[in-house]
Amino acid sequence: MDASVVRFSQSPARVPPEFEPDMEKIKRRLLKYGVDPTPKILNNLRKKEIQKHNRRTKRETESEAEVYTEAQKQSMEEEARFQTLRREYKQFTRSISGKRGGDVGLMVGNPWEGIERVKLKELVSGVRREEVSAGELKKENLKELKKILEKDLRWVLDDDVDVEEFDLDKEFDPAKRWRNEGEAVRVLVDRLSGREINEKHWKFVRMMNQSGLQFTEDQMLKIVDRLGRKQSWKQASAVVHWVYSDKKRKHLRSRFVYTKLLSVLGFARRPQEALQIFNQMLGDRQLYPDMAAYHCIAVTLGQAGLLKELLKVIERMRQKPTKLTKNLRQKNWDPVLEPDLVVYNAILNACVPTLQWKAVSWVFVELRKNGLRPNGATYGLAMEVMLESGKFDRVHDFFRKMKSSGEAPKAITYKVLVRALWREGKIEEAVEAVRDMEQKGVIGTGSVYYELACCLCNNGRWCDAMLEVGRMKRLENCRPLEITFTGLIAASLNGGHVDDCMAIFQYMKDKCDPNIGTANMMLKVYGRNDMFSEAKELFEEIVSRKETHLVPNEYTYSFMLEASARSLQWEYFEHVYQTMVLSGYQMDQTKHASMLIEASRAGKWSLLEHAFDAVLEDGEIPHPLFFTELLCHATAKGDFQRAITLINTVALASFQISEEEWTDLFEEHQDWLTQDNLHKLSDHLIECDYVSEPTVSNLSKSLKSRCGSSSSSAQPLLAVDVTTQSQGEKPEEDLLLQDTTMEDDNSANGEAWEFTETELETLGLEELEIDDDEESSDSDSLSVYDILKEWEESSKKE
């Protein structure tokens, strides 16, 4: 054998790391074939993979015992020496970059590059800024430049780029240039929760792709959980749908991720969306729900009161999967489950808003059949169902059963008991129940003492209620005093104790500062008890102080408008309405439509016109009272063109006005609607574009019956003379008040009577002067923007 040929069978100097199989890959393989990856199965597969690897390594080692030449041996030694030097260089670089403080600078560039290239990199990367140009580049200038760029380029950066604060005192660390997995998840969650977008938006797709995540099961659980904590359930649903809709990631779908999404939707009180996700899980073998998923959907439906849907879920829980289920490969797979105590408690929770008190007995029978023992929550929910259904005797029965079964009553149980005694009128028994709770060592909660305090205030014992408030203050995690006192004032108002409301309000000022909720409640108290001066004083104080805890909201203006309307203070009503609109709030049609109608009949027609235009500009349908009142006003003025426009609008509305309602409306306004105007309205009704609509046909029938039953020569007390021109011309809009006497010829010609200023003010009309200019018009024709402009100018003058 040649001497230059030697046998080289030694192993390399570097010991290979111990082999560790990829457990995530094993899990995905098991889920793909429908096997539940339990810890025992995973451990056995891990051992087998290690044994397989060891056998393969042994075979490769035996086969590598070959003959190498001197040149090959020298080449391998040089490669080993290079790897050693490379490892030492990495360790040295890591130790240098890890140092902080001192004069240790950052090594930039490569040793073989020129010094000019290194300096250029220093300028570009911002290293050693203080040494550049003798310190002319300062940190303050960089911060100022940052603010200028953010201000000028906000239209580019807004809702697109995350601008994070960077500490200029810290050195730039190349080792931390790229975020790790946790940082990438945090940034993605912050960006998604900061904007309302769905999976179809291009920014959403770009955010997901730029995150650099693989969207494994662990990463998806973290993302969905953190989005749920930020109350971003829409974004959580979008992430799950986008990730698992991709064909490359379909095999990565996880039941646990969908279960986490169910819990997020339940926490956000979105039962319909949760039900859709649950039905999607039922249609796929890979996502088929387990007991944890059934718990999530049951609790969500129970809190929403969807009893029928919850019972359907329980039926599906006991049935085998249908043949339409995807990925159904194992024939002997049987995921049938039986409801447990959590599911039955969810049924009781759903019975509370639906008042299904008979279902309580069925639940206890089912528990007995399945060998389940009711716990404290079961008895407490049963008591609450009976309380809301008015079965107070059964509330006490379940309380006794709870104590006899050995379950210790909790504070929430005593809260239900106190409320039941309150509704029964047993005030002393409610106080004794709370004292009994304290004697038994049950740690009370703020809700128990708050419930008892409201009970006492509702029955005129506010001084005793203050003692319960003192006990509540000593507890942890109790509600703030401002909210507590607001609830006590509301309880006293519901009990009819107005003096107690004011006494509690004065007592509250010594303990804490009233917030806007308390002020709104006092405005409600003053407004509903004819105390306009007190309400006005409090409202002026709220508006003038401009403090953070007393910022007027929509309820503030609403209660003040109600107080002004109840006291017939229409001038101040107009002032409050103007202030509300200038503050950016709009009137609630459902609550204040009747008040606007009363104000318009008192002479404040501009408010009704503004509210009507504002509602139309918002894209909503005005209240039916707005249409009918404006129609009667236009008919009385003789403005039949506007009347026809209103009729065309109301014909396309979602509501309908019957013939009886039209007739009652004309009878209600017979004092200022002439029979002649009704005749003319009936004649102009032919010009309507939607005559066949039910509302318009009912109006036509009512006008025909009204005009046919009365004489056309009959005139009301106040007649408005409207001179109509030929067809196609605009009718006169000025009210002609002429100096006439009560003669028959003037009455026949349709001329108006003359009234004094006091009589006109009483009738709710404004005296208008005759203007020869044809372009002049009264204030009712102003647009919503003109009215707002006048209000702003008047407020500036004040």
From Swiss-Prot:
Quote the protein name from its UniProt record: Pentatricopeptide repeat-containing protein At5g67570, chloroplastic
Under the heading PROSITE patterns, the entry gives:
PPR
Give the PPR repeat ranges: 254-284, 290-324, 340-374, 375-409, 410-444, 445-480, 481-511, 515-545, 553-587, 588-622
Q: Which family does it belong to?
A: Belongs to the PPR family. P subfamily.
The organism named in the record is Arabidopsis thaliana
Question: What sections of the sequence does the record tag as coiled-coil?
Answer: none
Entry's Gene Ontology BP terms? chloroplast organization; plastid transcription
Q: Name one Pfam family in it.
A: PPR_2
Q: A GO CC term?
A: chloroplast
Ranges for the region named Disordered are 1-21, 50-73
Assembly notes: Interacts (via C-terminus) with SIGF (via N-terminus).
Where, per UniProt, does this protein localize? Plastid, Chloroplast
Q: Which UniProt keywords apply?
A: Chloroplast, Plastid, Repeat, Transit peptide
Q: State its role.
A: Involved in the regulation of early chloroplast development and chloroplast gene expression in a SIGF-dependent manner.
